[in-house]
Amino acid sequence: MTHAVGSDLAKCLQQIGLKQPPDTPKIGRDSVQAQSSKIRISLLALAACFGGMVQTAVGAGEPLDTPSADDLLRAGQDDNNWVLFAKTYAGNRYTALRQIDKTNVGSLHLAWSTRIADNGQQETSPIIWNGRMYLSTAHDGVMALDAATGKLLWQVPYNPAYVLLYAVNRGVGLADGKVFVATADCRIIALDAGTGKSIWNVQGCLETSNSFYSMAAYIYKDQLIVGTGGGDSGNIGLISAFSVNDGERLWDWRSIPGPGEPGHETWPGDSWKHGAGAMWNGIAIDQGNDTLFVTPGNPGPDLVLKGRKGRNLYTNSLVALDIFGKKPRMKWYYQLVQDDSHDTDPAMIPVLFEGLVNKQKRSLVAIGDKGGDFVILDRGNGEVVHRTVVDKQEGLGVPPTKKGELACPNHGGGIQWNGGAYDPATNIFIVPSTNECAIFKITTDRPAYIPGQLYLGGALPKRQDATGVVTAIDVDSGAVRWRQLLPYPGQGGVLVTATGLAFTSDVGGNLYAFDAATGQQYWKEVTGSSIVAPIAAYSINGNEYLTVVVGEAGGQQTPNLPPTDGSRVLTYSLGSAPTIANDATGQVVLANAPNPAAGAGAPIKSSGSAPYTQEQVAQGAEIYARQCANCHGSNLQGVSAPALTGPSFGRSHLDAGQLRSIVVDTMPPTARGTLKPDEYAAVLAYLLSYDCVPPAGNGKQRFPTTDAPSLKRTTLGGTTCAVGPSK
C-alpha cells in the first residue's frame, strides 16, 4: 500500500514558504518528456519534502531497535550483523563466520533476490541488523528488507532536485532508531527505521552549485559524518558532522587551506578557490584515539596544470584528523601524487589493521589510488612502510596536451573506492584493480570556472576496453604473493573470511571466491548485471549469507561489458532451498524473472530529417564530451542520467522539438541556460547525428538557435548508428 502523503506534503511546503503543491506533472528520471514542463516551484524545496512519501509492504511499521553507539563500536565482535559500510570503523571487510569454507563454497546458491525499481549504478553496501537489511539505491532511495527472504518491508523513493555529476549512493547509516542517507542534491535525511517516515531533513553541503553527496552516511557516537563530491566541478572538498538527533551541524573541515592556513602557499594565486580535493568515497576511524582517516581527491581543474603547478595541498592525500574535540585537528598527512593532471584520486577507502612488518606487529593503514599505487603506512605518523604498483603505469607524469597524450591507468582505472581487505591469517592484503589506458586531451589551458559545470580544461577520455586484476600483497615485505586476472574491471572490493576465502567481483557481473593464501579459484557465479558494489556477510538462525547489490555499470561502463539485467539485491547461502525472487513492489515472483521495467513501452525508429551541419556536429561532440558525458555517458548510453540513444531512449517517443526544449530548459542541471544559443544548437546537432537522423537540405542547413515548427516532424527513436554519428 502507499502511505498517504498529501497533507504531510502540503504542511512541509507551507513550512518552507510555499502555499500548495505544484501543479506539474510527475517528475522522474525515466520520464524525459516530463522534464520539459515548466516547473513552477523550487525542485530543491520540493525534494526536502519527499522523505514522507513512503511505500510500505504488509507487516511494516512496527517499532524497531537499532544499533547503539556501543553496538557500532563493537561491530568487529558481532559477525551476525553488518552495521557499518565496511563492517567496522577500521574499514576491513573481514568476517569470522565459518559456515562457508573451501570444502563447500562451490555449493553456494542464490537464496533470494529482490528487484530494485530505482535502476542505475548501484554502489551501496547494505546494513544488516537483527534480521533486517537497509540499503540505499542509485538515486538516493532507501529500502528495508527482510534479510532472510528479501521481502520488501518499506521503501522511500527519492528524486534528487538535481544531479550535478553522478547519481550514485554508497549506503545508509543506522542508529538511534533512524536510517540516515545523504543525497545527490546535498540533503541529509533521517528516516524512521521501522516505517521509513521522514524525521528530519537538513541542508548539508555549504556549496550546492558544485557539490553533492555520494558517500555512505557514517555514524560515529552521536555524529553523522559525510564528505562531499564535486572535485570535477571546482568545489572545495568538505567533510562535515551532524547530530544524529536533529541534524544540527557540529563541525566542518575543508581540504583546501585558505589564506593564512598551513599549506595555502602550495596554491598559486587564487587557484585554491576551486582547488577541489573532494572527499567523496569513504572514511575509516581509529576508535581507540578518535582519529578519522580521509583521502581528499584530485585538484582542479582536473586536466590542466598551468596556474596551479605544485603540491596543491591537501589534494591526493591521506589525512589523519583528530575528531575528539569540537573541531577537527590535522595530525599528519601523506600526499600520494603531486602535479596531478590525470584525475588520479586516492580513491580507495582507507583500511586500518594490525599487521606484521619485520615480524613485529604494527598499527597500519592502507590506501590506493587510480594510478595503480598501493601504499601501506604507519597509522601513528604517516611513515610509508611499503609502496606496491598493482597496474601498468605509463605517461602519468606527462600533462595532457591538445593533441592528446596516452596515460595508463586512466581515471577509471587503478584502485577504486571499495579497495581491498586484510587477511590476518596470512598477513596478506588483497586488492582488486583495473587496467585501462586512455588518451588525455585538453581543450584550453585557461579553463573558466562556471558554477554547475565541469571544471576540467578538457573532456575526461572515453572509456576503453578494460580488464581487472586481483593482487595479493605480503604486508611484511610489500612483495606480490599472487595475482588473478579478471575479464572485466575489478571494482567491487574484497571480503575476507576466517575460513581462508577471499570473495570479490568484476564489473562484468561475475562473483568469485579465491583462496586467500594462494589465489586458487573455488567458485564463480554469473549474476547477469554489473557489480561495482561491495560484498557483505551476515548470519540469521545459524545460516550464513553473502549479499551484494548489482545494477548498471554507469560510470564504469566500458565497451567490452555484457548487457545487464537491471538492479537487484542478490543474497547467497549454502543448501538447496528454492530461490525466493521478489519484484520491486514486494511480491514474490519466479526465480530469475525478467525485469518488469524492461518491457515498458516499445522503442520506435527515428523518422524524418533535421537541419544541422557537420561543423555543428563536431562542435557539439566537443561540448557534449566536456559538459554532458559524465552523466549521460561518452557513448550516450546513460550513466547517472537517462540514455540519449538506444531502446530506452526510443521508448520516450520524442520529436526533435521536444528534445530541444528539454536540453535548452534544463541543461546543465545545476547551471541551466549557461551555454550560448549556438552551443545548445551544436549539442542538439550532435545528438541527432548520433541517433541516425539524416541532415536536411544536403547538410547545409544549420540547426536553429530558436524553436522551429519543422522540428516537430522529426521523431527520435534512439536508433544508434552502427558507425557512430553521420559523416
Q: What is the meaning of each model-derived region?
A:
Residues 114-125, 155-176, 201-216, 233, ...:
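Extracytoplasmic beta-rich repeat domains
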Residues 237-248, 311-325, 468-474, 565-575:
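Beta-propeller blade signature
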Residues 61-110, 255-262, 459-460, 466:
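Blade/loop signatures of beta-propeller domains
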Residues 617, 621, 633-668:
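Gly/Gly-Pro-rich "capping" loops immediately C-terminal to redox-active cysteine motifs
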Residues 597-610, 614, 621, 625-626, ...:
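Flexible coil segments in periplasmic/lumen-exposed cytochrome c-class electron-transfer proteins
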Residues 79-80, 130-131, 176-177, 221-223, ...:
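Short coil/turn segments that connect the beta-strands within blades of beta-propeller domains
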Residues 63-69, 73, 383, 387-412, ...:
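Extracellular/periplasmic ectodomains of large secreted or surface enzymes and adhesion receptors
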Residues 146-149, 192-195, 244-246, 323-326, ...:
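Short loop/turn segments that connect beta-strands within beta-propeller blades
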